Amino acid sequence: MAKFEEAENRMFNIKICLKCNARNPATAKSCRKCGYTGLRFKAKEPRG
């Protein structure tokens, strides 16, 4: 989707908390804001 591999990694190589929607590092085991362990990777393909 992105033009450069570095840009794509910056945009999509993060995890999103399923409870509070906070952005977390890709290496995170739990959310930095609420401590929830349910994390997903940010979607690389648009929905809809």
From Swiss-Prot:
Disulfide bonds: none annotated. Signal peptide: none annotated. One of its GO terms (cellular component) is ribosome. One of its GO terms (biological process) is translation. One of its GO terms (molecular function) is structural constituent of ribosome. Pfam families: Zn_Ribbon_1. Gene3D superfamilies: 4.10.1060.50. PANTHER family: 50S RIBOSOMAL PROTEIN L40E, LARGE RIBOSOMAL SUBUNIT PROTEIN EL40. This is Large ribosomal subunit protein eL40. The gene is rpl40e.
